[in-house]
Design a protein with these regions (language model features):
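Amphipathic alpha-helical scaffolding segments comprising HEAT/armadillo-like alpha-solenoid repeats
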Residues: 56-70, 89-101, 120-133, 152-164, ...
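Non-membrane alpha-helical segments in proteins
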Residues: 75-86, 105-117, 142-145
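HEAT-repeat alpha-solenoid elements in large eukaryotic scaffold proteins
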Residues: 70, 209-215
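N-terminal alpha-helical scaffold/docking segments in eukaryotic complex subunits
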Residues: 1-94, 98-102, 256, 276-277
């Protein structure tokens, strides 16, 4: 799958949208944060996924080391988790699953990211439990990203729910992951698109609207014609009227990437009329 669209802890990658989430909306236990800062263990495991470069690295040896580290004390477990945010190895899954219930939210968050990199059917139920009930925004945000790697699992409705009610940091990832969860055929694409259309219209956060536009572009090929028309109309309206320039640009990019002659002609007409540059 494609990794979608900074807060000080952790920094997200920037694939689907240009906007960071709002760090003030995230909750992290101050004592845990202070401890982790002192240990210099902060940083988003997802940065490891996005920046992974295996050139010159003995992946098998790295994974063997990671398996050993996951069975060690806290600092070693954090190092092992970073390895499995970079590399895939099914042997890691039995060691990652128990960390989903760790008391430390940074361990839980890192384990969630690692299970996004190493998808397993065994992880689906505990990940969904965390999305619905974990009281830490960083953990739920990580789950919203990771579930995009489980498109064949029953993740669609939980992601829709997260996009409806959770904090902005979680909503923007839910919007991105819906493009993957809904991209397996029309039966899932339509309800995913319906929620993304709603979020594109009403969500107060530009990051979420931007990722919703991105997701609609991704889902477009799997939608029936009436829904495709609705997507085009909504993206055009957003491109012309959204208050945030970044959202307008994302909507335009989504329209251009549809590669539909009629849509491209509409865009050219708007350029000719001076309504867009």
């Amino acid at each position: 799958m494609s990794f979608p669209p900074p807060d000080p802890l952790p920094e997200p990658p920037a694939t689907p949208g240009p906007y960071p989430e709002s760090p003030q909306e995230l909750y992290l236990d101050p004592e845990v944060l202070a401890q982790e800062l002192a240990q210099e263990l902060l940083g988003d495991p997802l940065d490891e996924i996005e920046g992974a470069d295996s050139a010159g690295v003995d992946v098998a040896a790295e994974c063997d080391l990671g398996l050993t580290l996951l069975q060690g004390p806290h600092e070693q477990r954090m190092q092992g988790l970073r390895i499995f945010c970079e590399h895939r190895d099914p042997r890691a899954v039995p060691l990652l699953l128990p960390l989903l219930s760790a008391a430390c939210p940074i361990l839980r968050m890192s384990a969630v990211y690692a299970l996004g990199r190493n998808p397993s059917p065994q992880a689906v139920a505990p990940l969904l439990t965390l999305l619905a009930g974990d009281d830490n925004g960083y953990v739920r945000k990580a789950v919203a990203w990771s579930l995009g790697n489980y498109p064949d699992a029953p993740v669609l409705n939980p992601l829709i729910r997260a996009l409806q009610v959770d904090i902005a940091a979680v909503r923007l990832w839910a919007a991105s992951s819906l493009a993957d969860a809904g991209g397996t055929g029309p039966a899932k694409a339509d309800p995913a698109a319906a929620q993304l259309l709603l979020s594109l219209r009403i969500d107060s956060e530009p990051a979420v609207r931007s990722n919703s536009a991105w997701g609609l572009g991704r889902l477009y090929p799997d939608l029936v014609e009436p829904r495709q028309r609705e997507v085009v109309e909504s993206l055009l309206h957003t491109m012309l009227h959204d208050a945030e320039s970044g959202v307008r640009e994302e909507a335009r990019l989504a329209l251009e990437q549809l590669e539909q002659p009629a849509v491209l002609q509409q865009l050219q007409t708007l350029v000719d009329e001076g309504l867009i540059a």
